[in-house]
């Protein structure tokens, strides 16, 4: 009787540990890269960073807070040269974005702000 209880407990613990490890791996993978493509540029500023990713046809950007937690004003703007800007603005806990634009053979300009501090790139990826 006691042996069956121990075996049952060990099996349940093994299943729980396996499921929790698999779940945390998915969360880490999602946090690593929200945008598709290769990392093209990272711009650091006081309260966070702008992350810019590029594929052949598209550019994607997001503003990530250095210390996630409380909701605060965040924004990210991505504009292809000669086109309209894609903007994500609001009160977020971790990041603003991602925003994506079609930028095949075009320069882009990226700007972002978190809690009153901002950064911008000028025209890049030309």
Report each predicted region and the residues it spans.
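Secretory targeting and sorting signals
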Residues: 1-27
């Amino acid at each position: 009787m006691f042996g069956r209880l121990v075996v049952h407990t060990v099996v349940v613990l093994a299943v729980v540990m396996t499921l929790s490890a698999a779940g945390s791996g998915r969360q880490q993978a999602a946090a690593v890269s929200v945008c598709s493509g290769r990392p093209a540029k990272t711009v650091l500023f006081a309260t966070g960073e702008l992350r810019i990713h590029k594929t052949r046809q598209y550019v994607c950007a997001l503003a990530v807070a250095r210390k996630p937690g409380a909701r605060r004003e965040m924004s990210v703007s991505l504009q292809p040269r000669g086109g309209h800007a894609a903007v994500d603005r609001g009160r977020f806990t971790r990041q603003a974005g991602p925003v994506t634009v079609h930028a095949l053979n075009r320069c882009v300009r990226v700007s972002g702000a978190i809690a009153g501090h901002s950064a911008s790139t000028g025209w890049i990826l030309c």
